[in-house]
């Protein structure tokens, strides 16, 4: 999946996460995480984000994650919505990502 434009998904409310994405000129993934629960769940948050990016074959992006204690399912949903917005597609290709 090609990220064409910057995008934002989520809120800064308790129990939610705000994620910002922007395309990079390289194939690197620049991941910055700021979380109220980073000491306990920082590795799990990072793993979840990288799993979703790998599933949709996303490379060459800068991600800024401001987590306020979001559950894993919320993190995944926000990230998938963000990828759809940033790539300019109306819906994710669910059948291709199994």
UniProtKB/Swiss-Prot annotation:
Q: Which Pfam families match?
A: ACP
| O-(phosphoribosyl dephospho-coenzyme A)serine: modified positions | 14
Protein name stated in the entry: Citrate lyase acyl carrier protein
One GO cellular-component annotation of the UniProt record comes to: cytoplasm
Q: Which family does it belong to?
A: Belongs to the CitD family.
| UniProt key word Oxidoreductase | no
For this UniProt record, give its keywords in alphabetical order, as a comma-separated list: Cytoplasm, Phosphoprotein
Subunit structure, interactors included: Oligomer with a subunit composition of (alpha,beta,gamma)6.
Q: What does the record give as the function of this protein?
A: Covalent carrier of the coenzyme of citrate lyase.
């Amino acid at each position: 999946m090609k990220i064409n434009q910057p995008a934002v998904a989520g809120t800064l409310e308790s129990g939610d996460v705000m994620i910002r994405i922007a395309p990079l000129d390289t194939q690197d993934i620049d991941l910055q995480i700021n979380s109220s629960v980073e000491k306990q769940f920082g590795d799990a948050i990072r793993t979840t984000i990288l799993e979703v990016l790998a599933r949709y074959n996303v490379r060459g992006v800068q991600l800024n994650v401001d987590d306020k204690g979001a559950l894993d399912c919320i993190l995944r949903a926000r990230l998938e919505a963000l990828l759809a917005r940033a790539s300019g597609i109306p819906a994710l290709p669910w059948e291709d990502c199994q």
